[in-house]
Amino acid sequence: MKFIKRCFLAALALALVSSCELTELDLQDNPNRVSPENANVDDLYNAIQLNVQDLIEDAWYATGSMARMVANINSYNYSNAFTPEALNDLWNEAYAQIFPDVDALVALAEPRGQDIHAGTAKILRAYVMMILVDMFGDVPNSEALQGTDIISPAADPGSVVYADAIALLDEAIAQLSGTDAVAPSYDNFYGGDAAKWVTLAKTLKLRAYVTTRLVDSNAPSEVAALLAEGDLIDEASEDFQFNYGSNRLVPDSRHPLYDNHYEAGDGDYVGNYFMWLLRAEKLDANGNPVVDPRVRYYFYRQVESSVDGSINDYSCHFSNFPTQEDQPAHYADIDPRLPYCVAASDGYWGRDHLNAEGIPPDGNLRSRYGLYPAAGQFDDNSFQTTQRLGTTGGGGAGIEPLMLSSFVDFLRAEAALTMGTGEDARALLESGIRKSMAKVISFGDLVPNTFAREVDIRGEIATVEELYKPTDKDIDDYVALVISNYDATDDQLDVVMKAYLIALWGNGIEAYNMYRRTGKPNNMAPALEPNNEDFVSTFFLPAEHVNLNQNVTQKAHTVRVFWAEGGPDVY
């Protein structure tokens, strides 16, 4: 169904953001815009929310792989890591669906006083506008959506699009504040609660100003004003997340990452570096690895050992087997403990960054997306294959974590360290970790039978919950270690951003932004091959846009987004 829809969207997009032989057609209206007289506001509203979810899904592999959450296996170098065709769908979701539908909805809703519909749709539009800039740099905005009046819209500078998005957020805040308008019949994000949408809009402004802090001298004062007002996402009930269902067919309402790993296909490789961050990166005072309490929720291991496979099970590149002694020298230059070929020996089976070796028959060996956020399986040491036609775990009834209260704490901690806001970065670091832990652990409610299952451990019977659910002490000990690391280093931003990256699991966009903005973590795993080309600072413009718009030429992947100019060099 999504394929069919996207084929239709691609055709619609041609007249919207592209140049083609249509000038002789006497079309007075934008052919992509739904006319108000033929539109139902609740139907449009639902379509906008679903298409925002689709856009985020389309961004996952690109952004998540650059943040090392998933392994990019397309190439050994950055210039070929993505083709211009790779993000056509995302572009069409924005320009052929979300933006025209928002315009149509606003035109229909505002004369009727449906301010919650209109204001919240504007917030989603502003959010998508910023994402497009984050991923591509300069994009059409002021000349877009003009139909045949402007069939080859020029790009606006990213800074201008960001400013327009912030202005749209302010417009939405004013429209929603104190309104008693009727709520949408269905709102996946906030159930029609206008106050929570206002909180989101202000939080997205915080996101914008922290993101642009390297280039905007006004950002510190804007952040200070938002902090003083105090209306930011700071508790789980305000989390900005898309909520999935568990329906498998017609329509499939499950989390896309559940479909990726729990049907019949092999799916993505989880990034070795990211799994290692949770499984083995941190050490206690005796040099022993400290395991992150979230690890069993984030990943499901299909095998007990990731180093006992046959030669045909691996594609390590520099060796036949995943022996740490064969770790390439440029890994050791960054961190001698960086994992090579697998994340850890006890079943954490992923793939290294930019490893384009062939794909071995390892579908039943790879580590899987776990219970959080995709509602897959909790890792209960059962070591079973997950390719069971979507019948296991939480059934895909997970979330798309877009802007959680934990994320906001980390953004505020970053702002405290880099913008002098006066807030306590150390306290915000701890708060962010604890909120993330609570959110993740709550997903155990999706699999009560798993946690109630009894296990015989050396003659002793215990439940999975008793054996593997993190205790308060587990959480306290982990938090204490991170805080100790924070206190012991001169690079406190590195500790905060590493904790932020871990909490961001499932959100590649914010992780990609954070890495380009801060250059953290300092020990980010490099590309598998040494002397790699420059990082993907922004993605290639989508092929459909470039090929069909006379005002566009393809750009290099090394062109930085405006807010990263003068920022750290990343690899």
Mark where each language-model region is.
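Bacterial N-terminal signal peptides that target proteins for export
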Residues: 1-8
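Short, compositionally biased low-complexity segments
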Residues: 20-27, 70-78, 134-143, 459-474
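Membrane-proximal, proline-rich intrinsically disordered regions
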Residues: 20-68, 74-77, 85, 89, ...
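Structured, solvent-exposed acidic/aromatic patches
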Residues: 39, 70-444, 489-491
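Short coil/turn segments at secondary-structure boundaries
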Residues: 60-64, 299-301, 508-517
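C-terminal functional modules
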Residues: 409, 417, 436-571
